[in-house]
Amino acid sequence: MPSDFVGRFFLFIFASRMHKMITILGPTASGKTPVAARLASEIGGEVISADSRQVYRRMDIGTGKDLDDFTLTVNHETITVPYHLIDIREPGTKYNLFEYQQDFYDVYQDIRRRGKEPILCGGTGLYIEAVLKGYKLSPVPQNQPLRDSLEGKPLTELTEMLTELKARNGSVMHNTTDVDSCQRAIRAIEIETYNLEHPTPRRELPSVDSIIIGIDIDRDLRREKITRRLQKRLEEGMVDEVQALLREGIPAEDLIYYGLEYKFVTEYLTRQVTYDEMFKRLEIAIHQFAKRQMTWFRGMERRGFVIHWIDSTLPMEEKIERIKELWQ
């Protein structure tokens, strides 16, 4: 581990002796971000995103950045809540968990040094768990012979291979939320294979003391919001957004790698499916994604995390007061 990274850990340990961090998690369409932004405005906080796709610039509508949520009116004044780890990478690159963990520690310590309160907010459970538990991760090099041997295998077979590797590793990484394409599954197999061949202690980095808030949304309401939001995003130009990325020269397979909106809209733009087929398949995929997110969060609870669930339909003021009571 580089010496400068070790030095940052000492600062991190010092920063961790302060107030508990607040983590706000929940499935897609549960309304996490407005809660995090409002809370930050009231406690002098800054929001750290835990979303594996919002790191990419110019991928705004499809990833649901909703940056307007960070602009609030407080006491008749307009304020912008600081946010982090959004728009930090170029489309076409592949941001990974190892990079996120390092970026999180840097941002977390900077917020603490300035006397502000960090609020981790997102739906990528693997990212959240990795930083809260301080999992030791390593950058995994490409294994071209392995990739060549996996090329052409269907996603179902790749998923079975990954499940077997995870069982051998005792790994909590790479659930099906993160491997919804063959390219992503092959990379996950590559990582799990490397970790199996190069075992390291799972916990070497400092964990983060955090109170965890879950935004609990009724299944039927969640499904209704997902469908309504998808229609709105398409009306707001999501297809044009993906088309612009393709015109930049970003390969279609790279956009498909990002999954969900970018996968299905790219398939539509490359004439693999009709518009109606794209909408129906994408709608189903997002519903399945939300279900898998909840499965991950329930798994976190089984692994010892305490999540305080708050009803998504409560008025914002009640949500904020409830979180403050738990935090203080």
Language-model segment annotations:
Residues 1-10:
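Positively charged N-terminal leader segments that act as targeting/secretion signals
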